Swiss-Prot record:
The keyword Cell membrane applies. GO terms for molecular function: proton-transporting ATP synthase activity, rotational mechanism; proton-transporting ATPase activity, rotational mechanism. It is found in: Cell membrane. Its main location: membrane. This is ATP synthase subunit b. F-type ATPases have 2 components, F(1) - the catalytic core - and F(0) - the membrane proton channel. F(1) has five subunits: alpha(3), beta(3), gamma(1), delta(1), epsilon(1). F(0) has three main subunits: a(1), b(2) and c(10-14). The alpha and beta chains form an alternating ring which encloses part of the gamma chain. F(1) is attached to F(0) by a central stalk formed by the gamma and epsilon chains, while a peripheral stalk is formed by the delta and b chains. The chain crosses the membrane at residues 18-38. It comes from the Bacteria. Belongs to the ATPase B chain family. The gene is atpF. HAMAP family: ATP_synth_b_bprime.
Length: 180
């Protein structure tokens, strides 16, 4: 068919400008026939490929839009989770501060109570030691008083008075011993 078209084109060129109606009709028929063949064998598949390509692009656009929406949704969820995490962290910090303050107050109160207890125990110990010292002092004073009194009595009594006292004492002991 192509060969026929070439022959017609060469024949028209050989006629040097003369219009040959047979050649025109032949070229017209060949053109129409070529268009029909192109439509049947090339245009349909070409349009099918174009349609597939268009559908593929539309599908890709739809998928990209869905992925974009999913990404936006995921981003919003992540932002919300981050916001919640920050709020939880803030709450935890506030609770930790409150707990630390409460523990500090408990420790201070406990330390004050312990200091007061130690102070009271020290006062009691001091008072007990003071009483012991006073008792020991009284004993020493009493012992010294007896010693001084005995020394004074020894000096004031004559030897004869001392003998009478000793004999009276021995007699009293014998009476007590005999009374048993």
């Amino acid at each position: 068919m192509l060969a026929a078209l070439q022959t017609a084109a060469l024949g028209a060129a050989a006629g040097h400008g003369a219009v040959n109606s047979g050649d025109i009709i032949f070229q017209l028929v060949a053109f129409i026939l070529l268009m029909l063949l192109l439509r049947k064998f090339a245009w349909g598949p070409l349009m099918g490929v174009m349609k597939q390509r268009e559908e593929h692009i539309a599908n890709e656009i739809d998928q990209a839009e869905k992925r974009r929406q999913e990404a936006e949704k995921l981003l919003e969820e992540q932002r919300e989770l981050l916001k919640q995490s920050r709020q939880e962290a803030q709450t935890i910090l506030e609770n930790a501060r409150k707990l630390a303050e409460e523990q500090k107050e408990q420790i201070v109160a406990s330390a004050r109570a312990e200091a007061e207890r130690v102070k009271e125990a020290a006062k009691q110990e001091i008072e007990r030691e003071k009483e012991q010292a006073m008792a020991a002092l009284r004993e020493q004073v009493a012992s010294l008083s007896v010693l001084i009194a005995s020394k004074v009595i020894e000096r004031e009594l004559t030897e004869q008075d001392q003998r009478k006292l000793i004999e009276a004492y021995i007699k009293d002991i014998q009476e007590v011993g005999g009374a048993r």
